[in-house]
Amino acid sequence: MENDPRVRKFASDGAQWAIKWQKKGWSTLTSRQKQTARAAMGIKLSPVAQPVQKVTRLSAPVALAYREVSTQPRVSTARDGITRSGSELITTLKKNTDTEPKYTTAVLNPSEPGTFNQLIKEAAQYEKYRFTSLRFRYSPMSPSTTGGKVALAFDRDAAKPPPNDLASLYNIEGCVSSVPWTGFILTVPTDSTDRFVADGISDPKLVDFGKLIMATYGQGANDAAQLGEVRVEYTVQLKNRTGSTSDAQIGDFAGVKDGPRLVSWSKTKGTAGWEHDCHFLGTGNFSLTLFYEKAPVSGLENADASDFSVLGEAAAGSVQWAGVKVAERGQGVKMVTTEEQPKGKWQALRI
């Protein structure tokens, strides 16, 4: 365009922008010179394409098909113990129609029945453990129309309470979340520390590797009740075999207890007396035996266990036995006494 007659005329008239344009080209002009040239020659600016935010539209699939195959645990011997690899079901997450998350937690210690329902039996024979591989798999069982989200996070402090809001949950490093109808995996970094297998007495901070935090929120009222399953996939080293151990947890109502962590007790002051609740920390079938030094207001009764049967009399110097089937962690039985810390003993056994 530098040969345009108009450019030659402006150059002959001494216009600096025209002279420079003829000799060196349009690209060498300054912004002000280009503006002057356009005005002099009546050149209109070309429209500039404006950036537009890219939106990717996703459609939920009509159906998702997948298959999971359970395998036998792999066990190998080591110099001072064994190495075991396996996969176990922790829980089934349920919908939560609230916008704030509802939490379910799982303590990471081989003696924890609510997390490791198979590993607990073998771990009871060893003094120490070390996880060398640890990950958690969420497997959906809800349709693709299910709303809200599911999140998994790991906290190294097993005694710390869950986050108090959604922002705190997502502030946890490594937190993974997705819609309920999509599966995902949370991989937890392990360390080289040997920890003690919990005995039900020690401070959890000294024996537990941490805890898994599971959260659900935002589901609709008409969504499926069950969202999906959470499984743990692990490789653990068990060290320093201790020999024979008890499969039963024993204790009294003063809080002294020993053995694997099968149950936890809580108490509240009611109108009829002190209400004692026994919560089972894992699922399965349990035997619970109580010895009363003093007659209670009421003996063993079902609170929310899936199945319950009781034998024996709730009287002074008597023993009551209950068979309890637990389908969900935290289900349990109850009794009422006149004393906050009644004299007596109890034994819990997984059968």
From Swiss-Prot:
Annotated region (P domain, projecting) at: 239-351
What does the record say mutating D208N does? In strain: Infectious clone UK
Q: Which Pfam families match?
A: Viral_coat (PF00729)
Electron transport among the record's keywords? no
Residues passing through the membrane, by range = none
One Gene Ontology molecular-function label: structural molecule activity
Q: Which domain of life is it from?
A: Viruses
Give residue numbers for sequence motif GW motif. 25-26, 273-274
Would you name any one GO CC term?
Answer: T=3 icosahedral viral capsid
Homology family = Belongs to the icosahedral plant coat protein family.
Fill in the subunit field for this protein.
Homodimer. Homomultimer. Interacts (via GW motifs) with Arabidopsis thaliana AGO1 and AGO4; these interactions inhibit RNA silencing ability of host AGOs. Interacts with host TIP.
Role description: Capsid protein self-assembles to form an icosahedral capsid with a T=3 symmetry, about 32-35 nm in diameter, and consisting of 180 capsid proteins. Also acts as a suppressor of RNA-mediated gene silencing known as post-transcriptional gene silencing (PTGS), a mechanism of plant viral defense that limits the accumulation of viral RNAs. May suppress other innate immunity by binding to host TIP protein, thereby preventing it to migrate in the nucleus where it could trigger an antiviral response.
Q: What is this protein called?
A: Capsid protein
